[in-house]
């Protein structure tokens, strides 16, 4: 294994350990020492890979983008097929509802309010998600030969807001034990718009 491969594997290990710490303690309660200990590396080694906690948080934004990439690729490949766009929405909702993802979403939102660099990195992911969904929604309308009730960008924003707000409620612990209060897949289908 080459040195570059080992460095990349170590960075992945550090990032996974940091994510576990962030989910358990939050960004501000997690120290670089906590991350080094969780990753099983020395503090010096950690600083060789990441100059500080903000760099790790920015790497989380890159990891989020990479995790979303396959979903977005499938959405692009849907070519306006309503059922496939609905599958994307359900898959994205399932991803956002994962406990770790939901808890991290709360942390990201709070950190984004305080740190413009973090806000910019995660906003880029959101813009990509919204733009890709808007394009798919436009194709759905064209395929079904209908005029959308909302502009595709606004419709995409409403759909993503519904999904992400459900995840934030979970991350805040407001939705524990209330599966009935969860975002209904039927609502996503309704927000997707009527067929022609």
Question: For each of these PLM feature ranges, what is it?
Answer:
Residues 21, 67, 95, 132, ...:
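Short alpha-helical functional segments enriched in proximate histidine and acidic residues
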């Amino acid at each position: 294994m080459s040195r570059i491969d080992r460095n990349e594997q170590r960075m992945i290990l550090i990032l996974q350990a940091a994510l576990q710490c962030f989910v358990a303690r939050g960004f501000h309660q997690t120290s670089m020492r906590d991350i080094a200990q969780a990753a099983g590396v020395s503090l010096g080694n950690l600083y060789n890979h990441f100059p500080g906690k903000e760099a790790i948080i920015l790497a989380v934004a890159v990891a989020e983008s990479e995790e979303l990439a396959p979903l977005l690729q499938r959405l692009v490949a849907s070519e306006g097929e309503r059922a496939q766009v609905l599958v994307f929405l359900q898959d994205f909702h399932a991803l956002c509802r994962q406990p770790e993802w939901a808890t991290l979403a709360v942390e990201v939102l709070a950190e984004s309010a305080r740190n413009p660099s973090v806000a910019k990195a995660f906003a880029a992911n959101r813009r990509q998600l919204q733009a890709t969904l808007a394009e798919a929604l436009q194709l759905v309308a064209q395929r079904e030969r209908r005029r959308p009730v909302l502009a595709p960008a606004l419709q995409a924003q409403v759909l993503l807001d519904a999904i992400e707000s459900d995840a934030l409620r979970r991350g805040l612990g407001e939705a524990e034990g209330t599966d009935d209060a969860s975002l209904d897949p039927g609502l996503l289908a309704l927000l997707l718009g009527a067929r022609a």
